[in-house]
Amino acid sequence: MERWWFNSMLFKKEFERRCGLNKSMGSLGPIENTSEDPNLKVKNIHSCSNVDYLFGVKDIWNFISNDTFLVSDRNGDSYSIYFDIENHIFEVDNDHSFLSELESSFYSYRNSSYLNNGFRGEDPYYNSYMSYMYDTQYSWNNHINSCIDNYLQSQICIDTSIISGSESNGDSYIYRAICSGQSLNSSENEGSSRRTRTKDSDLTIRESSNDLEVTQKYKHLWVQCENCYGLNYKKFLKSKMNICEQCGYHLKMSSSDRIELLIDPGTWDPMDEDMVSLDPIEFHSEEEPYKDRIDSYQRKTGLTEAVQTGIGQLNGIPVAIGVMDFQFMGGSMGSVVGEKITRLIEHAANQNLPLMIVCASGGARMQEGSLSLMQMAKISSALYDYQLNKKLFYVSILTSPTTGGVTASFGMLGDIIIAEPNAYIAFAGKRVIEQTLNKTVPEGSQAAEYLFQKGLFDLIVPRNLLKSVLSELFKLHAFFPLNQKSSKIK
């Protein structure tokens, strides 16, 4: 059973958004504090830099339940919150014995011979504790809601062995948003106990899977972060550029959302929208024919292929842009994708336009065999003419994931290569390498930050800064907004 404690519980301040859950429970967890108090140098506690321990009572955890939290309202009434993860129990109780034991231990610590021997002095942490316990700013409902919201929002991660009783590499996660508003809003008296089990409520405990999707019931409301497994409200996610609210991780974006992010409103002019694949090698699998898969992804995404190409303006600067979409068959590059990108490059060369390609692909499309592989050479040949003969400017933007034939061709041929933070970029994926070479791929060796240190990229640019960075790069290479050009001619 895991034991948790609010680090900010004993502050006089209200519960802060940063209140973390401490797993190392040898003593009460560390509280961040910028001041240094020589009276707090208590022996036999874990060392930790830049933090001070609240107090060092050796056996204080003997009477605290493994999953119990203590809170109080503005009237001075104290309540304990019990969260039994193994048995899926949530309980709130106002039994004061918990508080009495904690205060008794605190007074015992205060009056101990250790403090009387010169270490008692002024104890700001004790004062903060007493002030907090009897003079908090929150009412009961707001306090509990804030408390549980922060608790479930934090990175609560329980080994699946706790749930299933067996060893597993996966994790189980509690989703705060699923139970908030239903499990917490109680019309019962404050003195009553509230117990909620998964059978009677929407509190959900489930194992993480490779696709990292939330339960079907809430899939239309929430998007799960691939990094911290937190939930992001889908309605607001687009306005936040698909960046996780909890950890700042850059989630996948559709090609349409990227075009909306980079291209000025009303300036997008798509190219070759009616170009579709005709199953050139008549690839048929036992599960689903290739043509049926294409039709299925077309209905699902509203796209005809895994890339959108066209002309638009970026802060008034005319640009040719291609944006790959990982949601369409993993952004795989088939004959249509290769042809659309090649035509875009040729059009940019004829019109003397700067070129941007946003890469998000699993590589060449196996359902088209060697026809998909030859797209690598065809696109590279078009770029050779565009860059070396026409002397024009090409920016490659690598997003997560960019792998296979895209990495081995136009993805790495940019005059400037930009990667998004934490993007997964590789030629062969981790699983392929490990199965082929029978060697373990080091963790993080295919992440953008590691590859940047090895010199593979020029920049790692956060999504919210990308448009302004591109605008400055284009101006640096003598591509200016249309209105600015006309004013210079006059």
Swiss-Prot record:
A zinc finger (C4-type) spans 225-247. Residues 221-490 form the CoA carboxyltransferase N-terminal domain. Its EC number is 2.1.3.15. It is an enzyme of class 2 (transferase). It holds the Pfam family Carboxyl_trans. It comes from the Eukaryota. One of its GO terms (cellular component) is chromoplast stroma. It catalyses: N(6)-carboxybiotinyl-L-lysyl-[protein] + acetyl-CoA = N(6)-biotinyl-L-lysyl-[protein] + malonyl-CoA. It is found in: Plastid, Chloroplast stroma; Plastid, Chromoplast stroma. Expressed in leaves, ripening and mature fruit. Binds 1 zinc ion per subunit. Keywords: ATP-binding, Chloroplast, Chromoplast, Fatty acid biosynthesis, Fatty acid metabolism, Lipid biosynthesis, Lipid metabolism, Metal-binding, Nucleotide-binding, Plastid, Transferase, Zinc, Zinc-finger. Zn(2+) binds at residues 225, 228, 244, 247. Pathway: Lipid metabolism; malonyl-CoA biosynthesis; malonyl-CoA from acetyl-CoA: step 1/1. Signal peptide: none annotated. GO terms for molecular function: acetyl-CoA carboxylase activity; ATP binding; carboxyl- or carbamoyltransferase activity; zinc ion binding. GO terms for biological process: fatty acid biosynthetic process; malonyl-CoA biosynthetic process. Its cofactor is Zn(2+). Component of the acetyl coenzyme A carboxylase (ACC) complex. Biotin carboxylase (BC) catalyzes the carboxylation of biotin on its carrier protein (BCCP) and then the CO(2) group is transferred by the transcarboxylase to acetyl-CoA to form malonyl-CoA. Is up-regulated upon chromoplast differentiation, presumably for fatty acid biosynthesis. Acetyl-CoA carboxylase is a heterohexamer composed of biotin carboxyl carrier protein, biotin carboxylase and 2 subunits each of ACCase subunit alpha and ACCase plastid-coded subunit beta (accD). HAMAP family: AcetylCoA_CT_beta. Belongs to the AccD/PCCB family. This is Acetyl-coenzyme A carboxylase carboxyl transferase subunit beta, chloroplastic.
